[in-house]
Amino acid sequence: MSRNHVIEHGVPHGQPMVLAHGFGCDHNMWRSAWPAFADRYRIVLFDHVGAGGSDSSAYDPHRYASLEGYAEDVLAICEERDLRDVVFVGHSVSAMIGVLAAAQQPERFARLVLVGPSPRYIDDEGYVGGFTREDIDGLLESLESNYLGWSSAMAPAIMGNADRPELGEELTNSFCRADPRSPRTSRARRS
């Protein structure tokens, strides 16, 4: 599936483990993790449209205006590769994408491993999402006006490892490789 730059490792007929990256990253974020599972699982890595080696011409602002479009891509990968009994590992926004995919086709998934998920980023009465609506609006405006500058400033802060600046640099590079159109659609799903 060239749209999502799907790559496989591990046991060809083993239980599938699909590893899905978060915003601003690509399948390479899993490079240190997947080898630990390759002797037992069929490892399936991919890039969301707009990230890594995905087909950027496949980006459709209407399809990807909500997470359902990304969940449909996950299901298309599973269908094309005949993946069943899937262990889906989703980081950040991909955790929610995995939940949506599993809700549509629960028979396809054995387990969901949700790494750093947040169903909603905006604080509300009785709920801590981590941001105010103003925070999110400011973030989106910054993304739209200066994506590369935002990437360079935010990546080290997101990593939070001042003693390992190479991690912030790696995330900055990952953000800079991503198609900046992708996060802009999130205005429609910010609440």
Description of each model-found segment:
Residues 2, 7, 38, 44-93, ...:
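Active-site loop/oxyanion-hole signature of alpha/beta-hydrolase fold enzymes
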Residues 26-28, 121:
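Short substrate-entry loop that stabilizes the transition state in hydrolases
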Residues 99-145:
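Flexible "cap/lid" loop of the alpha/beta hydrolase fold
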Residues 29-43:
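Short amphipathic alpha-helix adjacent to the substrate-entry channel of hydrolases
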Residues 14-22:
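Short beta-strand element of the alpha/beta-hydrolase
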Residues 123, 127-131, 141-191:
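Conserved alpha/beta-hydrolase catalytic His-Asp/Glu region
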Residues 22-25, 92:
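Active-site glycine-rich loops that stabilize anionic/oxyanionic intermediates
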